[in-house]
Amino acid sequence: MKLKSVFRSVLKYRKTNLSLLLLITYSIITLLYIFDHERYKLNLPKEDEHPEFNDLLETAWGDLQIITASFHPYTSKENDKVHDYLLKRVLEITGNSSFASVSDDKESERSILFQQQDPFNESSRFSRVTYFESSNILVKLEGKNPEEEGLLLSAHFDSVPTGYGATDDGMGVVSLLANLKYHIKHRPNRTLIFNFNNNEEFGLLGASTYFNHSWSNLTKYVINLEGTGAGGKAVLFRTSDTSTAKIYQQSVKENPFGNSIYQQGFYSRYVRSETDYKIYEENGMRGWDVAFYKPRNLYHTIKDSIQYTSKASLWHMLHTSLQLSAYVASNSLDTADQTPACYFDFIGLKFFVISAKTLFYWNCIFLLVSPVVAIGLYLISRDRMTWKSHSWLSWTRFPLSLAAGIIVQKLFSNDIIRSNPLTFSRNYFWPISAFFTQVIFTSYVLINCSNFFFPCADMKSLSIIELFIILWTILLFTSKLLYSSDYRYTGLYPLSIFFLLSTIAAILRLLALALGMRTRKRLGRECRDHHSNYSSHSQIDMERDGQENLEQPQDQFTSSQDDQASIQDDNVSTTSAGPSHNVDEDHGMDSSSQQHDERVPLLKGSNSMEEGLSTRENSLKLEYTDYAWIIQFLLIVPIPSFILFNSVDVIMDALNHTVQEGSKATFDVLRFGMVGSILMALPILPFFYKVNYITISLTALLFLISASKTLLVHPFTNSNPLKVRFSQNIDLSQGNAASVHVLGREGNFLKPMLQDLPSIKYSSTHINCTSVTNGMELCMYDGMQPNLLSTNGNTNISSMVKVHVLHNNRNSTERSPYEPIVAELLLEVKENRACTLTFESRHQAKSPVREITVYQKKNSAPQKANITKTIKSASGINELQLHKLDFDQETYHIGVQWFPKLLTDGNLEDDKLGTKDELSVSISCYWGEYDSESVVNGTAVRKIPAFDELINYAPLSFSFTNEQKGLVIVKDAIIL
């Protein structure tokens, strides 16, 4: 009996037990979180157990070390070295294989000229034409069943000018090499194409060029490997539909990692990045975008190097892609369900998939059935007189306490915006923790103050029912969003799970009431908001509620003080006969026990049937009221808390560093943090008012620590730096001054850093900082001249870019006024791979340019061409982007045709000055090499000393990346 008493005491609904269960729940969630983030590091293949996988990993790691030895953007000579190394490795791997073929775009001189929407800004109305000379390396492995639709595996081998490209996208490239090596040994059933593509960083151009190759007709599916972060685990960033998500589920059995929340966030443009997957998807391919995604403040910086990644990260991407490609290559695929997918993994052990459309249907069923069942059970309990009526104050205290918590949270968020808006960049845990603890602490204080003055017998049950109503409203709203987005809001699934579990808990409570014992008469309100005698009695019992004397004896009708305190919520007998009797939730006294207490008024009425309850009936009642709360707790708290915590962590982990990219992103992250913390608090709010003083004291202490960290700690550190964008601009039309542009977030970060640079501190150099759009700040100053070329004479920067007009018939008397104007330009640019021409007319609202011709020069004189590529646009062309491979070819030969003003507006007017048909052409050419030297007059000098100075002297709390496709931009302008 003593053991039974101890067991029952441990499971009673009392403060200590509830607090302990909350501690256990959050401890388990924390351990699962750590397990999820660390487990992949322990799963490296061992040579004695998996020799083939171990060899693939070690070889891939060696390849990664070689290709990331230096910066290798498309605009650099190192880019060619990486291309040549990859080609050598591909030829080594394929060897004399009878089913392998290799195609090198550089050798075949493949180029494209096409009209392109800005891939990084879908809202842009800027009309762009791009010319690109490709050096993609393609490998075809002909399958045993070549009639099956083929699979493309793709990764890009270029980096940005400021990063070594270990994660972006070196690990993707070496994973492709490992996949190639594996499939050479294990011939696939379906044809595989490998695309080691170039120049993804500045236009997704390598992927675009793929569709100019005949092999593109063989492939229907794609696995794109990418890195939009700097290490960690490779996530299934997005996938085409439910069928492809299920293929991932069936194939990636070890360490699956994916969440459709990422997919929704990416498509909603909360992340200002893009991958080659966009191009493949737009061209009708279906597949998987597997990518590294964090941390963004190291992405595209010098810390995207092999020092900041690991074999564990490489193996996670390599093994994921290998499992997926091996499955797709060898199995027939069920691809019928093409609706968007909701998917997530459980700590890397299990992967779950459901169609977003199916989820919507289930939501509709939940929304329709749950209120019908709830209302039906309520009416039954009313009819059976087992429903206890409650005052309006009892019904409103939970929603009002929640509303008060949200209001206080909003006030606190205003303090964050005023004092430390970028705090999420350093550590999103502290602001989320502050929001979370503030909401639950506010609720605790308000509910307990209300209970002190106006005690309520059934607070937990009322709160659970009201939580059900709140979540029903939220689910209705999110289901509408899901439907209106054509089922593309795939990150809303956690709310469906939360609603389902909370509904079960609420229905169980209503079911217990409906099946409870019928009373002869209504027992009146249990939440006695008046009756001072009862209130004083209740207050005494509330004080006793925290005591834990397990040895206290019990008679057959009354329990110990802790027993009575444990009966707070579930006031329904589970017996098959006899009436239910009232139980005061927060005061621990039922009507049968009250008659033995001298504090109960002598004239107080009692139910005669209650007085006759048998010992067995009372025992059954105590069992139910002791343990039913545990079922409700286990339904509402652990699983929803874990899913919501994981969802908030997924969002913040991907977005917290985007606060550095503008004020809009800052407000987005703040809003996600606020809403996420409220959702995380909802599962425990129906119970939290009951925790003991130790728990609430720790909650208050955690809030104070979190709030202090959030408001007072500097947002940037060595490990979480502020990412700043650099470019050095030389405008030849305004002189040869080499103006340094440094772009970053507002907040007095940039200017103090720049003022401490030696070239500025010991000179009279002026720094001009101005606010630009979206909360960004641009600082400019005259920096040290770049040394882009090796020379034996004085470096003349004006010789870097020269523009020659070969032909222009604008003022020709032989041209009809209704005839388009034609001009030819020759750009002479030294050791260059990328230039941009922008067209503008001062007299026409839209660009009048309708046709562009690129003359491809091979071995002929600069004025001649072997091949021409022409593109036309009826809507006008604003910009021409040029990308060529040959550094020794120092010219771009361009033809431009534009409409005179007469053709665009039909207004024949005098043009005495002869300027109305003028076309302004702005030329910008880019150089991306900085970690190398030029030899000037026999002396080795750094190419971009202004950037070196920033790298060497800026605090470690800053990191640097390129603002444009080159670090040095030389500009000029002409009028045609």
From Swiss-Prot:
Could you give the cofactor binding note from the entry?
Answer: Binds 2 Zn(2+) ions per subunit.
Report the transmembrane regions from the record. Answer: 16-36, 360-380, 393-412, 429-449, 462-482, 497-517, 628-648, 669-689, 693-713
Q: Does the keyword DNA-binding apply?
A: no
Q: What is its EC number?
A: 3.4.-.-
| Organism for this UniProt entry | Saccharomyces cerevisiae (strain YJM789) (Baker's yeast)
Q: Which GO terms describe its biological process?
A: proteolysis
Which residues make up the binding site for Zn(2+) 1?
Answer: 156, 168, 226
- Where on this chain does Zn(2+) 2 bind? 168, 201, 300
Q: What is this protein called?
A: Vacuolar membrane protease
Tell whether Plastid is among the UniProt keywords. Answer: no
In this protein, the residues bearing a glycan are 96, 121, 189, 212, 217, 656, 768, 796, 811, 866, 937
The molecular function GO annotations come to: metal ion binding; metalloexopeptidase activity
